[in-house]
């Protein structure tokens, strides 16, 4: 078993019309043993940036703290919030810095420009190689199932409510096919005007 799948868990980011959704499951485990059913993997960086982290839980926590420190330092130095593409570049460079002793995490990043409504999605591997599609990105133990569900359900120009419905159905259906993810999910729905968090009930078995 890969160390990336040891703690289980999956994340998905999906783009719509001037909005995006980042969604993660709630399971934390040690291989097939479930430790907790209330461990979401989303990190709200600011009003327009949400990051999901999958991989080894200890590295998720440490890496999230280091990312938070770097973004706060950026805010102090630049006297403004970091934008989406700069944040993705920051995360990618932090992972590449540690390439010889890597963080066992796979970030999924969703961002929106508050003025223009432009959505930017990015996912990286554990050494920071970015993937920047226009529709959706996913990572975690049920990434293959998520890809299939997203290909079937996603379409361009989805409004926030439709996008949430599609992302939630994709996550729940994919988790039903994976024993290392599941136990419900949590979603962050982000538009130009607001950020809303929703809890999604799922199977508890």
UniProtKB/Swiss-Prot annotation:
One Pfam family here: Proteasome
Keyword set, alphabetical order: Cytoplasm, Nucleus, Proteasome
Gene Ontology annotations of biological process type: proteasome-mediated ubiquitin-dependent protein catabolic process; ubiquitin-dependent protein catabolic process
Main location (coarse class): cytoplasm
Location in or out of the cell: Cytoplasm; Nucleus
Residue intervals passing through the bilayer: none
Organism superkingdom: Eukaryota
InterPro entries xrefs: Ntn_hydrolases_N, Proteasome_beta_3, Proteasome_bsu_CS, Proteasome_sua/b, Proteasome_suB-type
Record GO terms (molecular function): endopeptidase activity
Gene Ontology CC terms, in alphabetical order: cytoplasm; nucleoplasm; proteasome core complex, beta-subunit complex
Its biological purpose: Non-catalytic component of the proteasome, a multicatalytic proteinase complex which is characterized by its ability to cleave peptides with Arg, Phe, Tyr, Leu, and Glu adjacent to the leaving group at neutral or slightly basic pH. The proteasome has an ATP-dependent proteolytic activity.
Family: Belongs to the peptidase T1B family.
Oligomeric form and interacting partners: The 26S proteasome consists of a 20S proteasome core and two 19S regulatory subunits. The 20S proteasome core is composed of 28 subunits that are arranged in four stacked rings, resulting in a barrel-shaped structure. The two end rings are each formed by seven alpha subunits, and the two central rings are each formed by seven beta subunits. The catalytic chamber with the active sites is on the inside of the barrel.
Entry protein name: Proteasome subunit beta type-3
Species of origin: Trypanosoma brucei brucei
């Amino acid at each position: 078993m890969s160390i990336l799948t040891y703690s289980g868990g999956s994340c998905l980011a999906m783009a719509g019309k001037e909005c995006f959704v980042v969604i993660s499951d709630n399971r934390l485990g040690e291989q097939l043993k479930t430790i907790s059913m209330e461990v979401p993997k989303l990190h709200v960086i600011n009003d327009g940036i949400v990051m999901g982290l999958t991989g080894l839980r200890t590295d998720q926590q440490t890496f999230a703290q280091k990312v938070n420190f770097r973004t706060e330092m950026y805010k102090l130095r630049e006297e403004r919030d970091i934008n989406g593409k700069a944040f993705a570049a920051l995360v990618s460079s932090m992972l590449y810095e540690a390439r010889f002793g890597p963080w066992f995490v796979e970030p999924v990043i969703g961002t929106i420009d508050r003025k223009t409504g432009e959505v930017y999605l990015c996912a990286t591997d554990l050494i920071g190689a970015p993937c920047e599609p226009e529709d959706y990105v996913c990572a975690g133990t049920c990434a293959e199932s998520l890809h299939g569900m997203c290909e079937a359900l996603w379409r361009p120009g989805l409004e926030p409510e439709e996008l949430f419905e599609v992302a939630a159905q994709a996550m729940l259906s994919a988790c039903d096919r994976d024993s290392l993810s599941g136990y419900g999910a949590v979603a962050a729905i982000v538009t130009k005007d607001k950020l809303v968090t929703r809890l999604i009930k799922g199977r508890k078995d």
